[in-house]
Amino acid sequence: MKRLISISLFLCLLLSVQAQKVYTTDNIPKVHLQNKMRYVCNPDGILSQAACDSIDRMLYALEQQTGIETVVAVVPSIGNDDCFDFAHRLLNEWGVGKKGKNNGLVILLVTDQRCIQFYTGYGLEGDLPDAICKRIQTRNMIPYLKDGNWDAGMVAGVRAVCGRLDGSMVNDTDDEEDISFFGILAAVIGFFVVAGGIGW
């Protein structure tokens, strides 16, 4: 009887692992290309519909006000692919950003890698440099994401990005002096940091 229970548990675990879909830039739904009012690709329902709607509204308003085009992709797995490379390919293959301005932004969350990645087009690097991306990730997103609160983390992160890009963020500065020594130390010790992306 115990052996049967063990086998059943093993099979359930195996099926659970197999059921987790691995996404590539070929099979991930091109949501924004199909509907310009939708900015969130959330094929496995990791985010709630309410969170997706909130993010869609913020990113639509941002694009109307600034012309900056942003897409958010939230997936359980990209296999052994690298978050930075994956986000880069999404930006290029989806054509995120206005033609001639290269002002697109991809925000990618991969839950099994515990990775949150920002990838900016060249035209946006001055407005959203790596230091600011990492600050938004560590201050606004990681505290929620590390607890598995995907909705709160992604909504807070997108809100901070919009505040930065539309000029509404209060007391914001490019100066890295406002990032304390202890904040930097915590980021180095507690997180794995890669060019606009962080694992927690």
Regions of interest found by a model, annotated:
Residues 1-24, 184-188:
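Bacterial Sec-dependent N-terminal signal peptides
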Residues 20-184, 199:
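Folded, non-transmembrane soluble domains that reside on the lumenal/extracytoplasmic side of membranes
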Residues 192-200:
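Alpha-helical transmembrane segments
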